[in-house]
Amino acid sequence: MAEGDEAARRQQPQQGLRRRRQTSDSSVGVNHVSSTTSLGEDYEDDDLVNSDEVMKKPCPVQIVLAHEDDHNFELDEEALEQILLQEHIRDLNIVVVSVAGAFRKGKSFLLDFMLRYMYNKDSQSWIGGNNEPLTGFTWRGGCERETTGIQVWNEVFVIDRPNGTKVAVLLMDTQGAFDSQSTIKDCATVFALSTMTSSVQVYNLSQNIQEDDLQHLQLFTEYGRLAMEEIYQKPFQTLMFLIRDWSYPYEHSYGLEGGKQFLEKRLQVKQNQHEELQNVRKHIHNCFSNLGCFLLPHPGLKVATNPSFDGRLKDIDEDFKRELRNLVPLLLAPENLVEKEISGSKVTCRDLVEYFKAYIKIYQGEELPHPKSMLQATAEANNLAAVAGARDVYCKSMEQVCGGDKPYIAPSDLERKHLDLKEVALKQFRSVKKMGGDEFCRRYQDQLEAEIEETYANFIKHNDGKNIFYAARTPATLFAVMFAMYIISGLTGFIGLNSIAVLCNLVMGLALTSLCTWAYVKYSGEFREIGTMIDQIAETLWEQVLKPLGDNLMEENIRQSVTNSIKAGLTDQVSHHARLKTD
């Protein structure tokens, strides 16, 4: 059977990863799991469940595809539907157990022991034989990542609970966080999506719970919470901290009880803690309904250093196997199963398909802010603070020049002051020590300049409002329109152009009504939008009609005066010469 699979795989291109998968036969039992050869021969990361032949037996199916070129994710809807919409399970409440955490920390390795339990849960020796290779989700030793996107086991287990109900159990494996090919957004999306869709999220950590582990958890869960609809309760269900390679059993013993004591100590909010540390812990408590922790010993040197290790129990330390026998039933025993709920309602297999579709669309869009690395977030905050400080220097200085209690200042003087103070603000910005480098900081300097120009435009309007002639521009314009229409109406009526006279009277009436309305708005402060509209119309008339007309008349008058002066001068000169000749 393995040879047939190998031949089928050779015929498929690597792009087959995107091909739609066929649903496995759920009646296939444990024999398929235990009869496979080592994972290196049976399942490869690039050959996940692409052919009908492979799909006839239980195996991992990638339902969320990771595109490395554009750092985007795609849901394989058909594969997910074929797994969860099988007739015998689609209306059952679902239990989703997911394992997430940093890459190369043994998530897939742990899930394969969960598979052994699910196929042999009625046996005391479910953990397997000493010489049996570990198969199921693909895993291997080494330092490079193995899993990408999100995978699920294509056989959904139907379990009878002690209360007589049946539930469907789905096991989920996720792409490891913080590898060299994933952005912070990639890591946050995978972790958030798996947390949103799982009822139990196992947070797989190595050796200890570091403060940065909690900060990343805060970031990832907040990214998930933002994508969910407005809810008034804790958005996620159970988070199980799984501390691998625990080296301090003399302080906190292996297992659940020692983990509980350790977690209480780590997540305790103390009065003397910095506010940032308190906020991280409060956020985690507010996001999850249940928190737990399990301390797991190191599996042994053979596991860590043997390149040919294939999961055989004979190579694993007894302490690890003993605690593993306690951990897996704690998560998957019928009496311990946690059914998936969203907003207090149980979720069926059919419902979960729709939630997956809705959530992936959110993360494919641009509605959510992009999470950033700590350096980038700190650099942005640092530069924004420098921008705010420099802008404040500019605003305070300009207030001294043309603030509310200062008299009107000539526009040319105001512009000169603006340019001087703008340069002072830019020097202030440049003098602040900032993170991110020159190119990064240049964007914020451009932002500062734009904000200063916007503020300057407001100061110009404020200064113009103090000019009595500017304040009287609207009534003067309307009065000029009324006067002009009155004269034109009289002249056109006198020569018999009654239609034009009526039109001029109508315009004069509108101008008079506008003038009265404007006066009422300025007096009462009501209907300010109407007053603004009248000001804008008057401004347009002034700039486009009256001012050019006045300038032309002024130029014509000046030109005529100069011409007359020249003529008078020439006449005087000619007269003077004539008198001289006569004399």
UniProtKB/Swiss-Prot annotation:
This protein's record includes keyword Transmembrane: yes
InterPro entries registered for this protein in UniProt: G_GB1_RHD3_dom, Guanylate-bd/ATL_C, Guanylate-bd_C_sf, Guanylate-bd_N, P-loop_NTPase
Reaction(s) the record says it catalyses: GTP + H2O = GDP + phosphate + H(+)
Modified residues (N6-methyllysine): 270
Superkingdom classification of source: Eukaryota
Chain residue ranges for the region called Autoinhibitory domain: 547-583
BP GO annotations: cellular response to type II interferon; endoplasmic reticulum membrane fusion; endoplasmic reticulum tubular network membrane organization
Ranges in coiled-coil conformation: 256-284
EC number(s) per entry: 3.6.5.-
Membrane protein topology class: Multi-pass membrane protein
Record's compositionally biased regions (Polar residues): 24-39
Entry keywords, A to Z: Coiled coil, Endoplasmic reticulum, GTP-binding, Hydrolase, Magnesium, Membrane, Metal-binding, Methylation, Nucleotide-binding, Phosphoprotein, Transmembrane, Transmembrane helix
Ranges for domain GB1/RHD3-type G: 91-336
Region feature (3HB (three-helix bundle) domain): 374-465
Residue numbers spanned by region N-terminal hypervariable region (HVR): 1-60
Positions of modified residues (Phosphoserine): 24
Amino acids binding Mg(2+): 108
GO cellular component terms listed in the entry, alphabetical order: endoplasmic reticulum tubular network membrane
Lumenal-side segments: 498-499
Region of interest (Disordered), ranges: 1-45
Family in the record: Belongs to the TRAFAC class dynamin-like GTPase superfamily. GB1/RHD3 GTPase family. GB1 subfamily.
Biological role: Atlastin-2 (ATL2) is a membrane-anchored GTPase that mediates the GTP-dependent fusion of endoplasmic reticulum (ER) membranes, maintaining the continuous ER network. It facilitates the formation of three-way junctions where ER tubules intersect. Two atlastin-2 on neighboring ER tubules bind GTP and form loose homodimers through the GB1/RHD3-type G domains and 3HB regions. Upon GTP hydrolysis, the 3HB regions tighten, pulling the membranes together to drive their fusion. After fusion, the homodimer disassembles upon release of inorganic phosphate (Pi).
Entry protein name: Atlastin-2
Annotated organism of origin: Mus musculus (Mouse)
Lineage per the UniProt record: Eukaryota, Metazoa, Chordata, Craniata, Vertebrata
